[in-house]
């Protein structure tokens, strides 16, 4: 009986370790494809494969979100201010806000969202969405970018998206480094400290 218990416990432990290893390996291999091109708040093209040789902090949002999205953006503003004081923001790291609702979040809407947080339109924080002319293909691109980082979302039909609650730190080649919680759980000091260690 004791032998069976030991074997069962060992198998359960192996299963847990295998599961943890799977998720660690999956995250380590996560990367936004370089071929993805989206539209900025200025109606310019942003291609992930272009020479953006900076770390990137990425959040996925929709501007009609009533709580967690604007809370995250506000906390990222506080983080931006910390990074600006040390001369890191813009020089070594770029912020990206990607809309998961490009039908409503036009470039103009994204610019208004940016302005509502007092964010400078200087290219150091880029707001990405789809283009009206290619909205269907851009929807797929946004989904591909999100899925590459295991960020999931769905519109249940009422315009209020159900979505994952993580932001993502990427390296200069858009490869996953670490994820951080969104909303009230986003700790700007913790993220600041982690980013500083990467530089």
Predicted regions and their residues:
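N-terminal targeting signals for export/organelle localization
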Residues: 1-39, 196-199
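Short loop/turn microsegments at loop-to-beta-strand junctions
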Residues: 33-34, 55-56, 164-166
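A short beta-strand-turn-helix
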Residues: 37-55
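Short active-site neighborhood of thiol/selenol oxidoreductases, capturing the structured segment around
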Residues: 49-70, 76, 95-96
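Structural microenvironment flanking redox-active thiols in thiol-disulfide oxidoreductases
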Residues: 75-142
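Sec-exported extracytoplasmic/periplasmic mature domains
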Residues: 81-88, 115-119, 147-151, 175, ...
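Thiol-/selenol-based redox modules, centered on thioredoxin-like
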Residues: 152, 156-199
């Amino acid at each position: 009986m004791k032998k069976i218990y030991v074997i069962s416990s060992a198998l359960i432990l192996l299963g847990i370790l295998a599961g943890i290893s799977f998720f660690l390996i999956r995250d380590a291999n996560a990367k936004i494809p370089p071929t993805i091109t989206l539209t900025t708040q200025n109606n310019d093209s942003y291609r992930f494969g272009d020479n953006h040789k900076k770390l990137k902090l990425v959040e996925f949002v929709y501007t009609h979100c009533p709580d967690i999205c604007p809370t995250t953006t506000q906390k990222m503003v506080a983080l931006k201010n910390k990074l600006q004081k040390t001369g890191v923001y813009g020089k070594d790291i770029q912020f990206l806000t990607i809309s998961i609702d490009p039908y409503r979040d036009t470039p103009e809407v994204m610019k208004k969202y940016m302005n509502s947080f007092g964010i400078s339109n200087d290219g150091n924080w880029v707001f990405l969405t789809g283009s009206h002319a290619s909205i269907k293909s851009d929807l797929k691109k946004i989904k591909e970018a999100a899925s590459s980082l295991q960020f999931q979302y769905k519109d249940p039909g009422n315009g209020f998206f159900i979505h994952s609650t993580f932001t993502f730190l990427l390296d200069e080649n858009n490869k996953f480094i670490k994820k951080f919680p969104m909303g009230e759980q986003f700790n700007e000091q913790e993220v600041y400290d982690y980013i500083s260690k990467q530089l």
